[in-house]
Amino acid sequence: MFKPKKKLGQCFLIDKNFVNKAVESANLTKDDVVLEIGLGKGILTEELAKNAKKVYVIEIDKSLEPYANKLKELYNNIEIIWGDALKVDLNKLDFNKVVANLPYQISSPITFKLIKRGFDLAVLMYQYEFAKRMVAKEGTKDYGRLSVAVQSRADVEIVAKVPPSAFYPKPKVYSAIVKIKPNKGKYHIENENFFDDFLRAIFQHRNKSVRKALIDSSKELNYNKDEMKKILEDFLNTNSEIKNLINEKVFKLSVKDIVNLSNEFYRFLQNRGRL
């Protein structure tokens, strides 16, 4: 009997109700090409194969090959890619949707890799606490860097809370099925790399004002504290709206506010040759 590997974070989804919930949430048609990350025993893969034109499955664990071979005997629209999902070049795969029970230890990096690649819709399984942070609104305890990094690029919603009993082996925590739809055009991010550095800097001190957070985390933007103080003094003189935002506590700013502030700060630094 196959034993899931702890080091790979393997918790196989075995409850057919939640498999169906994930597939239904993806609104699949016979025109859709789906990417799945993590084969497991193929229970989700089979439902995807029934409902989509083609299914790509990325799986790192070759010991699951018997399950893969059995599925490929039954369905001719499944292609298995043996490898690490974080290393596979997703641009070489022509999928438009993603449905997966993600290994939880790669939740964050694989989510942003997928968003960068682009897709029409994703339905992904996460730890429930992680999912709550993804959908959190400003002013709440779960609102943080992850919330803004995701919501500035996609609309997210929790579709279902999933109990440990839905998996084998049972994890110690609840999970959640999350629907993600890229929101291209909703927010304009001037420079993606700068924006991510800006988020890292300010959310290290989420309970402080943006001004204090930027000074205390100035190294994230490659400045020392004295340089950042001087830069912010000059920046504050640009307009009154910026002054209000920069003196507000980080966790109270909306996604829109943070995107706008990051863009203004980026342009300010660029115009003065400080980048």
From Swiss-Prot:
Record-linked Gene3D superfamilies: Ribosomal RNA adenine dimethylase-like, domain 2, Vaccinia Virus protein VP39
The protein's Enzyme Commission number: 2.1.1.-
GO cellular component: cytoplasm
Domain of life: Archaea
Residues bound to S-adenosyl-L-methionine: 13, 38, 59, 84, 101
Protein name: Probable ribosomal RNA small subunit methyltransferase A
Record-annotated membrane-spanning stretches: none
Family: Belongs to the class I-like SAM-binding methyltransferase superfamily. rRNA adenine N(6)-methyltransferase family. RsmA subfamily.
Main location: cytoplasm
Matching SUPFAM superfamilies: S-adenosyl-L-methionine-dependent methyltransferases (SSF53335)
MF terms in GO: RNA binding; rRNA (adenine-N6,N6-)-dimethyltransferase activity
Purpose: Specifically dimethylates two adjacent adenosines in the loop of a conserved hairpin near the 3'-end of 16S rRNA in the 30S particle. May play a critical role in biogenesis of 30S subunits.
Keywords, sorted A to Z: Cytoplasm, Methyltransferase, RNA-binding, rRNA processing, S-adenosyl-L-methionine, Transferase
Location relative to the cell: Cytoplasm
Record-linked PROSITE patterns: RRNA_A_DIMETH (PS01131), SAM_RNA_A_N6_MT (PS51689)
Entry-linked NCBIfam families: ksgA (TIGR00755)
InterPro entries for the chain: KsgA/Erm (IPR001737), rRNA_Ade_diMease-like_C (IPR023165), rRNA_Ade_Mease_Trfase_CS (IPR020596), rRNA_Ade_methylase_Trfase_N (IPR020598), rRNA_adenine_dimethylase (IPR011530), SAM-dependent_MTases_sf (IPR029063)
GO biological processes: rRNA methylation
Organism this protein belongs to: Methanocaldococcus jannaschii (strain ATCC 43067 / DSM 2661 / JAL-1 / JCM 10045 / NBRC 100440) (Methanococcus jannaschii)
